[in-house]
From Swiss-Prot:
Name of this chain's protein: Movement protein
Keywords attached to this entry: Host membrane, Host-virus interaction, Membrane, Phosphoprotein, RNA-binding, Transport, Viral movement protein
Lineage: Viruses, Riboviria, Orthornavirae, Kitrinoviricota, Tolucaviricetes
Quaternary structure note: Interacts with host protein HFI22.
Protein task: Transports viral genome to neighboring plant cells directly through plasmosdesmata, without any budding. The movement protein allows efficient cell to cell propagation, by bypassing the host cell wall barrier.
Subcellular location: Host membrane
A cellular-component GO term for this protein: membrane
Family statement: Belongs to the tombusvirus/aureusvirus movement protein p22 family.
Length: 189
């Protein structure tokens, strides 16, 4: 693994300054580019790393979201990146709410997180506050991810995968008005 990229041998505080320079996502929706600010991450209070050497940065992270439902369906949610190297599963980044009924391309130059060169990459991504009129099991969109490490020119990627509504509560977030109507009819019966 050490041959795939060059190590960044800098003190952690220097590396932190370097990686936080690009903490915005460029969102490409159709023909327009918009910048979506990332909510601040509070990882410095919990991260356990040595003060120097052996850590690299994930960079040029590109996430493409292709909808599998109509734009009129009103599917939206916040994309997050989470560190799963410990049991807390602390959140590294979270976007504002995105309209997931259109194709979206997210590009981030740096991720405010550095991983040890001797470990697997302990980062996962997903969605929260997902609003969807569909019941669980419905495929909403597919996602592909590409990234680079440190100073390497090599690109890494995850194969395109389809995302489904995982929990009934997600679907119920937009069905609350309908639920009130249903409860009135139930009480009148």
């Amino acid at each position: 693994m050490d041959t795939e990229y060059e190590q960044v041998n800098k003190p952690w505080n220097e590396l932190y300054k370097e990686t936080t320079l690009g903490n915005k996502l460029t969102v490409n929706v159709g023909m327009e580019d918009q910048e979506v600010p990332l909510l601040p991450s509070n990882f410095l209070t919990k991260v356990r790393v040595g003060l120097s050497g052996g850590y690299i940065t994930m960079r040029r992270i590109r996430i493409k979201i292709i909808p599998l439902v109509s734009r009129k369906a009103g599917v939206s949610g916040k994309l997050y990146l989470r560190d799963i190297s410990d049991t807390t599963g602390r959140k590294l980044h979270c976007t504002e709410s995105l309209d997931l009924g259109r194709e979206i391309r997210l590009t981030m130059q740096h991720l405010d997180f550095s991983v040890s060169t001797r470990s697997d990459v302990p980062i996962v991504f997903g969605f929260e506050e997902l609003v969807s009129p569909f019941l669980e099991g419905r495929e909403l969109f597919s996602i592909s991810v590409r990234w680079q490490f440190g100073l390497s020119k090599n690109c890494y990627s995850l194969p395109q995968s389809k995302w489904k509504v995982m929990y009934q509560e997600d679907a119920l977030k937009v069905l609350k008005p309908s639920k009130k109507k249903a409860s009135k009819t139930d009480s009148s019966v």
